[in-house]
């Protein structure tokens, strides 16, 4: 890997380490690009609190921290400023003007919840419900076609235990949409490292059949994740086994 665009900070409440430690480890690994893409704040109705993302009043500090590191390490490594954003169509109109007033270089789409998160199950929970899978695919396709995102992180996160034929049908639809709108799909190193449901081999078989482009994403929640050569090797083996079109870098899409 020469680039990683999927890096978190402690502001999301489930990552550790200083941003500087991630950058130093990236230099150790010979990376040319280390993009930070922590979980974006969202403006939810009522008193709902989303525990796995930064608060809105932390966004300015996040931006300042990344831009400061970019200036300090200029000439040694590129440090683009990004966010990982869930595609919640009903909530985006309030959030997007805020993000567009900031020097955000890119967004990556992650979809751990369908709907608007508040009253929906986590997409990674096991389900045999065909409708949940269909809704996940519908919402992520809408997100890909929105033009907001540079790539789709862990698209195979959904944990569907129903009929393989249904999974193939729906996820092929997702992959076809990704191909049609030139949306790279992320092979997620954190999922591989922790033995999660993703990377899902059946999904990547479909992605290969549809000719999708892919990118490796460390999804780093600790500085040591940047140094994890073993997991990188395993993900590269998956890419080679399915003859996937691996992108070393991706063009960033501004919002």
Which residue stretches match the model-derived regions?
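Hydrophobic alpha-helical segments and helix pairs
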Residues: 77-122
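Mid-to-C-terminal alpha-helical segments outside catalytic/metal-binding sites
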Residues: 229-255
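An N-terminally biased module of ancient metal coordination in phosphate/nucleic-acid-related enzymes
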Residues: 1-85, 89, 99, 161-175, ...
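Short amphipathic alpha-helices and their capping/turn segments at secondary-structure boundaries
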Residues: 19-32, 90-104, 136-146, 172-176, ...
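Short, hinge-like loop/turn segments at secondary-structure boundaries
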Residues: 52-54, 125-126, 203-205, 232-235
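Domain-core and long-helix interface of multi-subunit machines
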Residues: 13, 109-210
